[in-house]
């Protein structure tokens, strides 16, 4: 293969059969269970990277079911998102996500900088409630429940919340083990079509694990729970801060 061919074809690895395709990345009937809880503010400040700022001692714990996604297939994801500000702009910082499908793990890490790891999350309706779980290996590290569709939420307001900015810390090492890329990335959900939004009584239990430390941000109080269904496109990102250039 000629050098010019390598340059023109280079997108992702392996060169001749990339682990994930080029976008756009559209999700149909993407289902969320988002349980917002109050936690220890000191622990939040320890893990949220500057120039992001912690605004409230809150965490959004998310279980996301994605049965129909272009290029990524059928998978489920779970993890923690922290409300933050960047230069006065409110948004969410993704701390870690755990999922069960290689293409979105590879694509998420390489394209955007999503902090994704392989695990076994689930999200489904269990009789009268919606149930989210996360297993890391043989250990159950998260269990979330919410009464099924107890009360409708304003879908316009929920669409606005989904459309807000999201932030990621993208880290890619050089071949010598030093940081080659260390950037704060911002991205948005686009072309959102809300199909439903509900709330209800909720619970969240987090258990310690050395490699899936979701319990490091302890649940002190449940603040809000939302069950959402939407079609949306995962927009590509932009670098808002380069740690290596400063």
Swiss-Prot record:
One GO MF term on file is: acetoacetate decarboxylase activity
EC code: 4.1.1.4
Question: What are the coiled-coil residue ranges?
Answer: none
Recorded catalytic reaction(s): these are: acetoacetate + H(+) = acetone + CO2
Q: Does the keyword Lyase apply?
A: yes
User: What is the top-level taxon of the source organism?
Assistant: Bacteria
Catalytic site = 116
User: Which keywords fit this entry according to its UniProt record?
Assistant: Decarboxylase, Lyase, Schiff base
Assigned protein family: Belongs to the ADC family.
Could you tell me what this protein does?
Catalyzes the conversion of acetoacetate to acetone and carbon dioxide.
| This protein's name | Acetoacetate decarboxylase
Originating species: Burkholderia multivorans (strain ATCC 17616 / 249)
Gene name on record? adc
